Amino acid sequence: MSALDVPMKQIRNTPVVLGEADLLKTIQLLPGVQAGMEGFSGLHVRGGGPDQNLILLDGIPIYNADHLLGVFSIFTPEAMKKVTLFKGSFPARYGGRLSSIIDIRTNDGDMQNYHGTISVGLLTSKLHFEGPIIKNKTSFCLTGRRTYLDLVARPFLPEDKKYNYYFYDINAKVNHKF
């Protein structure tokens, strides 16, 4: 089985376009994976097309994994715990695709302490916060991101028209030990 765990540190430290760490662009740098077009997040694994990949987020299929025609992926690194890429000979439970499986597991949240980060980038801002609800029993993880493309584009658009050129992502998870 050709499974590869993608280290979270590698995702966060990969040189990026527009200052935003991106899971799919990091995967494009791995052997056997090619990008569709420069700067976009389409994946061609071992000759297959982007529609032949299965992307799972905690076991749930994701059919549209990017924003702005592939410039940004929907996955924020702070919300991810583990990423596994299967480039061939994947288990039968992942059936239905020809090229690859990207299995993403989200962060469970810290059972002991509260902590978080706020980051402001060239085109996006992010917030990540996690901690216990009930220590050693229940935790949460909350991550949000918003672009300000609408603010950047405003000076170039007619004054009588308002366009909403932006997107936002919110990932929330509550984890409880029974």
Language-model features and meaning:
Residues 67, 113-115, 156-161:
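Extracellular loop and loop/strand-boundary signature of outer-membrane beta-barrel proteins
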Residues 93-94, 112:
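Glycine/Thr-rich phosphate-binding loops of Rossmann-like dinucleotide-binding domains
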Residues 90, 152-159:
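Hydrophobic alpha-helical membrane segments
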Residues 23, 41, 98-100, 114-116, ...:
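Hydrophobic, lipid-facing positions within transmembrane beta-strands of outer-membrane proteins
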